[in-house]
Amino acid sequence: MANEVRVARLESLIKDVINNALANEINDKIAKLARVTAVRLSNDLSVAKIFLDAHKRESMPKVLENVNKVSGLLRSKLAAEWTSYKVPELRFVIDETIDYANHIDELFKKIKQQEN
């Protein structure tokens, strides 16, 4: 397994390159709505799981679909910056963290209301 510092640096590079490409180099207006919130590399660095979010949560399925359509271009942008042996396969997923945090907030509000 690659050391933690190297993995963190590579994950940060992927996040920066993909966010920059989505914001500045992609012509797809729907894909431009996406923002990378986190990246997790596999132990062998062959797969990058990229977590996406968009301002309008209800548009995420369409955003994810369009980002997947331009994934080849995104991977080529990453290849230009990549310093390791092989550019990882990019797998895009919807980041559920915000939904989970909102759910937890709602639970806390219900508990607080029940206490009053």
UniProtKB/Swiss-Prot annotation:
Annotated InterPro entries: KH_dom-like_a/b, RbfA, RbfA_dom_sf
Sorted keywords for this record are: Cytoplasm, Ribosome biogenesis
Q: Please indicate which superkingdom the organism of origin belongs to.
A: Bacteria
GO BP, sorted A to Z: maturation of SSU-rRNA
KW Cytoplasm (keyword) present? yes
**Which GO cellular component does the record give, naming just one?**
cytosol
State one molecular function term (GO): ribosomal small subunit binding
Where in the cell is the protein located?
Cytoplasm
Answer yes or no on keyword Glycoprotein: no
Q: Which HAMAP family match?
A: RbfA
Q: Which family does it belong to?
A: Belongs to the RbfA family.
Oligomer and partners: Monomer. Binds 30S ribosomal subunits, but not 50S ribosomal subunits or 70S ribosomes.
Q: What does this protein do?
A: One of several proteins that assist in the late maturation steps of the functional core of the 30S ribosomal subunit. Associates with free 30S ribosomal subunits (but not with 30S subunits that are part of 70S ribosomes or polysomes). Required for efficient processing of 16S rRNA. May interact with the 5'-terminal helix region of 16S rRNA.
Under what name is this protein listed? Answer: Ribosome-binding factor A
